[in-house]
């Protein structure tokens, strides 16, 4: 049930960010670590321009939205696990900024299908 959005600098092509391999490992990691039922949904959104500290810079940000009731410690643990996974699939090491956010879905959330 997790909703995962990966925003990334468009110029990080498959040689610099292996999105397919990352997604294959990300889904089971998030479902297992968050103790979620169902399957995760992952959306990749390329951004033509990304800036860090006012300078154009490559960047990858993962947002994970879950149903409420996870503790801050559980969310932090999941963020750390996903950040470590990102490090395995984003080439360029410290030259690419990576971040992860785990948040609750709003009460209005509904799913069909």
How does the language model describe each region?
Residues 1-113:
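A domain-level signal for the structural core that forms small-molecule/cofactor-binding pockets
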């Amino acid at each position: 049930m997790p909703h995962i959005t990966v925003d990334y600098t468009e110029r990080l092509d498959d040689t610099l960010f292996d999105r397919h391999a990352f997604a294959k490992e990300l889904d089971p990691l998030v479902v297992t670590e968050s103790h979620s039922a169902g399957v995760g949904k992952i959306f990749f959104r390329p951004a033509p321009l990304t800036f860090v500290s006012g300078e154009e810079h490559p960047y990858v940000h993962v947002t994970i939205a879950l149903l409420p009731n996870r503790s801050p410690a559980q969310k932090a643990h999941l963020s750390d696990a996903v950040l470590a996974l990102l490090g395995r699939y984003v080439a360029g090491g410290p030259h690419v900024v990576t971040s992860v956010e785990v948040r609750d879905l709003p009460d209005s959330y509904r799913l069909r299908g």
